[in-house]
Amino acid sequence: MSTEKTYPMTQEGKQKLENELEQLKTVRRKEVVERIKIARSFGDLSENSEYDAAKDEQAFVEGRITQLENMIRNAVIIKDTGEVSTVVTLGKTVTFKELPNGDEEAYTIVGSAEADPFEGRISNDSPIAKSLLGKQIGEKVTIQTPGGEMQVEIVSVK
């Protein structure tokens, strides 16, 4: 049995990672190698900040390539069945209103590999998602956040 971590994600999220990996392997890797060549041409490497910066960037790019390959290899695709659901599950967009003020927020709950709060995609490991997963429309939920406790009511699940 494999002990490697799995990465739940949508097909769209996996495609984004594959695109980033391709870009790193075909474009960024070559750019960094070229920067290293240029920096080497400046002579003494012991005091060559351009060379050090290029080597640091190379280490970052290679590390990210390894990370992406691992995430893609261990991806578990969240299938959107298209079925209407009343229960909050991974891959669904949940709308809730804060109590008592009624302000509404909506988030799509995804795996950590494709989470981007600025795009409304939160990780299933986040405090908000952990509190909402498995709950139903109409349920009132208390969410523990770093900023304190928040009461919400689930309005819709898509």
From Swiss-Prot:
Transcription regulation recorded as keyword: yes
Keywords: Coiled coil, DNA-binding, Transcription, Transcription regulation
Disulfide cross-links: none
Coiled coil: 3-75
Protein's GO biological process: DNA-templated transcription elongation; regulation of DNA-templated transcription elongation
Superkingdom assignment: Bacteria
PROSITE patterns: GREAB_1, GREAB_2
InterPro entries, A to Z: GreA/GreB_C_sf, TF_GreA/GreB_CS, Tscrpt_elong_fac_GreA, Tscrpt_elong_fac_GreA/B, Tscrpt_elong_fac_GreA/B_C, Tscrpt_elong_fac_GreA/B_fam, Tscrpt_elong_fac_GreA/B_N, Tscrpt_elong_fac_GreA/B_N_sf
Gene Ontology molecular function: any one: DNA binding
Pfam families in UniProt: GreA_GreB (PF01272), GreA_GreB_N (PF03449)
Keyword Repeat in record: no
Classification via PANTHER family: TRANSCRIPTION ELONGATION FACTOR GREA (PTHR30437:SF4)
Protein role: Necessary for efficient RNA polymerase transcription elongation past template-encoded arresting sites. The arresting sites in DNA have the property of trapping a certain fraction of elongating RNA polymerases that pass through, resulting in locked ternary complexes. Cleavage of the nascent transcript by cleavage factors such as GreA or GreB allows the resumption of elongation from the new 3'terminus. GreA releases sequences of 2 to 3 nucleotides.
Annotated family: Belongs to the GreA/GreB family.
Protein's UniProt name: Transcription elongation factor GreA
Lineage of producing organism: Bacteria, Bacillati, Bacillota, Bacilli, Bacillales
